[in-house]
Amino acid sequence: VKKINNSYVSMIWQSLSEGPNMDSSLIGLNLSNEESLSLVLLELITPCYDSFPFFIKERCRNSLAYAINFYDEELLLRLYESAIPLFDPPNNLTMKKFYVTVWGSLFPEESFLINNPEEYVEIYFNELYKK
């Protein structure tokens, strides 16, 4: 069973919210620019994800894969915006393509395709941090 929740998807995006440790040179980057997007993936999203405990990483990965496979553009955008990011999403990519780009950066050798959706179980919010 793979535990998922939309909050895990939002956790990935929270690294793009304003924080005391954010490098000021990154603020205002345009994610439609490929170099800027790569920089944000490398400097913000990946280190933040890497800092999560293993079980949270696993759930973020599973939740992101589920979102890519089954959510529409509107819900993908809403999950991105729920983290109150400092960056507008790229205007030259669909939200799904943006999510796939982030997936490729975080999990370069893994496929996001889901063959057995019944393996994925949505857990309640109060269970997010329970192993």
Give the location of each predicted region.
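Amphipathic alpha-helical interaction modules
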Residues: 22-75
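Amphipathic alpha-helical binding modules
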Residues: 77-131
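C-terminal catalytic/scaffold cores in eukaryotic proteins
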Residues: 12, 16-17, 63, 79-80, ...
